[in-house]
Amino acid sequence: MFAIALLSFLVVLINAHPPMHAEMHSAVVTLANEIDTNYLTSPAKIKIVAPLESALIPGGETYQLRCDIMSTPAATIHWKFNGKLIQGSNELNVEEKLLNFGKAIVDTGIVASILTIQCPSAENSGTYSCVGYNGHQTIETVAEVEIEGEASGCRSNHKSAPEIVFWTDSRFEMTGNVATLVCRANQQVDWVWMSNDELVKNNDKFTVLSNGDLVIKNIVWDDMGTYTCIARNQFGEARQETFLYPTAKKSSF
């Protein structure tokens, strides 16, 4: 109980004073790993679904890199350009671990992320890396992107529709547990979630967080299906779908 109390305290500090300091992040990871070791129903593992591919693209032509990672427990994704962080983070979802504490957990699925290179020019040529991290292991896939020619006539993207850059593609979790469906955008947006063409409303079971994530408590078999995350602003919207699969309940360890 001391470990869970300390983890709860660290989570409060993290949420109150982001970004997370290295020492605090290390402490959270250590305690989260202890929870995983005691309650995960399968060993930790992580895999790149499809590696990035190197590309030669014309200057000024918007280009997207996509990265999908299968993992237990669920992974985070961040992107690097020539070794420097440019998008995402490696902060784990410790809040869900707290909500499921003391229960057997599956915490398995696929997360996806896209990195958009807007109006690229020669300075955008280089090494792009997608890095997946599940608290136990780190995995990386790399692409060399070369920009050929100059960019011209590029428009500012300050007044543009949002883009969903990180989301849960699929998630397996045990019935009776909490499951988080992740959805993050590249700018401040209004969030909407749909299920079976119906609006998901905040209540005792469903909570849409300010960062876009959907938290579903006490999942049951009837919760299985496709959920649609929608990010909106005054210039348009973006959508991504995720599939939730509740698994048969097992006894706590």
Swiss-Prot record:
InterPro entries registered for this protein in UniProt: Ig-like_dom, Ig-like_dom_sf, Ig-like_fold, Ig_I-set, Ig_sub, Ig_sub2, Neural/epithelial_adhesion
Free-text disruption phenotype from the record: At the L1 larval stage, display defects in the positioning of the ventral nerve cord (VNC) axons characterized by axons of embryonically generated PVQ and PVP neurons, but not of RMEV, HSN and AVK neurons, from the left and right VNC drifting into the opposite cord (axon flip-over). These defects are not enhanced in a zig-3 (tm924) mutant background or in zig-3 (tm924) dig-1 (ky188), zig-3 (tm924) sax-7 (nj48) or zig-3 (tm924) egl-15 (n484) mutant background. In a zig-1, zig-2, zig-3 or zig-5 or zig-8 mutant background, cell body positioning of ASI and ASH head neurons is normal.
Disulfide cross-links: 67-130, 183-229
Biological process annotations from GO: neuron development
Transmembrane listed as a keyword: no
Segment forming the signal sequence: 1-16
A Pfam family recorded for this sequence: Ig_3
Record flagged with keyword Signal: yes
Gene3D superfamilies: Immunoglobulins (2.60.40.10)
Cellular component per GO, a single term: extracellular region
Ranges for domain Ig-like C2-type: 43-146, 162-245
Cell location: Secreted
Tissue: Expressed in PVT, ASK, BAG, M2 and ASI neurons. In L1 larvae, expressed in pharyngeal ectoderm and mesoderm.
Keywords: Disulfide bond, Immunoglobulin domain, Repeat, Secreted, Signal
Biological function: Required for maintaining axon position of PVQ and PVP neurons postembryonically in the ventral nerve cord (VNC) by preventing axons drifting into the opposite side of the VNC that could occur during body growth and movement.
Protein name, UniProt field: Zwei Ig domain protein zig-4
Species annotation: Caenorhabditis elegans
